């Protein structure tokens, strides 16, 4: 069995019985705010061809850095069998059917599914509110000899259930941040420093708990961090020592693994890991060049950014422009939702100011009303580029 990293949480798993393509993400996500790091737009031709012809497709969950809809439409046959997590809702299946996929292999949460000839998979799902739309999932793959756990960014609550399938050779695991907290909050610098440090520490602590519980032969840092090439967001990359960033790179996680004598594998898109009596790692470039990506990260990111600045400019021209009825549209959309959610309104307990460019909108949670802001008291404030609000609406 071998696993080739293709960027972020993307993994191409090859066994003698067939291949599984996991979470391929290539197009910048979230309105161009997230890019794959290290970049994966330069895979060699052989690998680029192979990942377009998998025997199975696995999409862990609905987030844009895992479900790259445009790439799937452009590159993967809709006849490819999809390994479907056992979510309580059908949202992921509906999205994939909308893209043209028709062959789904339904799984039961945590139960091994025999794909034939000693190839088996099990998908473990999590469905708490923090797991996002429809939930999140982790994949266990066994070829009868070796076993991989692709936990990606799934916060698995029952780690014993993952381990119950047998000893683990490779554990793919998120360790870095994947949200904008706390950087986008309005906090004094000292408080922001405290919040950022606490967030990074908690991320590492959670990842190390998973590492100790699963006790794999090797741990592969996965599912982040992304990088930020938009000039307005570039400062959120973990470059300067005093930056307010929750996105440490692999080298810092590897250092933590080394400190407790765990085998961590640094990787970039194209890194191939082959399982046998030994674990063999082959990078697509020289080891020194791999290390340079992280040791000279700012230079690497600036070069990467230069290739996408025009793309970013063009992408922003596609955002919806100002319309005269944004307030009315939001009022008609949100007030019925507020009426359906009295417990939520009580929980929020205050009004929220939405500042969309020069338009100020008050979302009055206690009274379930959306109206123009008239200098009333409010408990929360969001400042969002109006073009983004218009585009989402």
Language model feature labels by segment:
Residues 17-62, 69-74, 131, 156-167, ...:
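Pre-active-site segment of Zn-dependent metallo-hydrolases
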Residues 159-260:
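Cap/insert and terminal regions of metallo-dependent hydrolase folds
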């Amino acid at each position: 069995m071998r696993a080739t990293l293709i960027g972020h949480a993307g993994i191409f798993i090859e066994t003698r019985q067939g291949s599984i393509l996991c979470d391929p993400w290539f197009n910048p996500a979230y309105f161009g705010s997230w890019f794959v790091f290290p970049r994966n737009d330069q895979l060699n031709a052989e690998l680029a061809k192979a990942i377009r012809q998998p025997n199975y497709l696995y999409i862990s969950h609905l987030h844009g850095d895992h479900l790259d809809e445009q790439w799937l439409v452009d590159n993967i046959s809709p006849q490819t069998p999809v390994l479907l997590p056992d979510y309580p809702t059908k949202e992921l299946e509906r999205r994939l059917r909308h893209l043209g996929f028709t062959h789904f292999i339904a799984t039961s949460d945590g139960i091994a599914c025999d794909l034939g000839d000693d190839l088996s998979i099990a998908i473990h799902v999590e469905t708490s509110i923090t797991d996002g739309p429809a939930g999140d999932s982790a994949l266990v793959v066994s070829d009868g000899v070796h076993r991989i756990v692709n936990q990606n960014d799934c916060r698995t609550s029952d780690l014993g259930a993952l381990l119950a399938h047998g000893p683990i050779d490779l554990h793919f695991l998120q360790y870095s941040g994947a949200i904008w907290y706390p950087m986008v909050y309005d906090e004094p610098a000292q408080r922001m420093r405290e919040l950022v440090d606490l967030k990074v520490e908690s991320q590492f602590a959670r990842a190390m708990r998973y590492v100790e519980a699963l006790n794999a032969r090797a741990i592969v840092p996965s599912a982040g961090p992304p990088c930020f090439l938009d000039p307005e967001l570039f400062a959120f990359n973990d470059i300067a020592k005093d930056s307010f960033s929750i996105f440490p790179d692999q080298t810092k996680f590897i250092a933590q693994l080394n400190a407790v004598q765990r085998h961590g594998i640094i990787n970039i898109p194209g890194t191939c890991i082959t399982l046998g009596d030994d674990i063999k790692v082959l990078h697509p470039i020289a080891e020194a060049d791999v290390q340079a990506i992280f040791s000279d990260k700012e230079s690497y990111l600036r070069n990467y950014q230069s290739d996408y600045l025009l793309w970013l400019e063009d992408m922003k021209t596609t955002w919806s422009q100002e319309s005269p009825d944004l307030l009315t549209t939001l009022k008609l959309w949100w007030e019925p939702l507020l009426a359906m959610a009295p417990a939520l309104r009580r929980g929020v307990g205050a009004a929220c100011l939405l500042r969309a460019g020069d338009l100020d909108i008050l979302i009055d949670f206690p009274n379930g009303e959306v109206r123009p802001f008239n200098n009333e008291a409010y408990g929360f404030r969001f400042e969002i580029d109006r073009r983004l609000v218009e585009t989402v609406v």
